[in-house]
Amino acid sequence: MSMTDLLGAEDIKKAVEAFTAVDSFDYKKFFQMVGLKKKSPDDIKKVFHILDKDKSGFIEEDELGFILKGFYPDARDLSVKETKMLMAAGDKDGDGKIDVDEFFSLVAKS
């Protein structure tokens, strides 16, 4: 399964292009632009599993740095600052990784 099976390819491209500048990433706007917030819990869970590259059941900080590439392969990596800000927003229990429930909360806040 790929991201374009769940979200519109054109929406993804526009969202990625909106955040090409370093330190411009805003997860709330990005999730809105790709239409993630409007998706069913099942589809949001599928997106989580696509982003969980090592299939550990968590999105760790190193995977988070590549989150845009999970949506669009030619996208840039997040900066260290952007990655840390996204982790701080998503990691509610402070274990240094985002589980599926924390990801749901992150999407719901967008």
Curated annotation (Swiss-Prot):
Positions of modified residues (Phosphoserine): 2, 24
Gene Ontology cellular-component terms listed: cytoplasm
EF-hand domain location: 39-74, 78-110
Keywords of this entry: Acetylation, Calcium, Metal-binding, Muscle protein, Phosphoprotein, Repeat
Binding residues for Ca(2+) 2: 91, 93, 95, 97, 102
SUPFAM superfamilies associated with the record: EF-hand (SSF47473)
Residue numbers binding Ca(2+) 1: 52, 54, 56, 58, 60, 63
GO MF terms, alphabetically ordered: calcium ion binding
SMART domains xref list: EFh
Residues with PTM N-acetylserine: 2
InterPro entries, alphabetized: EF-hand-dom_pair (IPR011992), EF_Hand_1_Ca_BS (IPR018247), EF_hand_dom (IPR002048), Parvalbumin (IPR008080)
Main function: In muscle, parvalbumin is thought to be involved in relaxation after contraction. It binds two calcium ions.
Domain comment, as recorded: AB domain, comprising of helices A and B, is involved in structural stabilization, protecting the hydrophobic core of the protein. It is required for high-affinity binding of Ca(2+) and for Mg(2+)-binding.
Family designation: Belongs to the parvalbumin family.
Name of the featured protein: Parvalbumin alpha
Annotated gene: PVALB
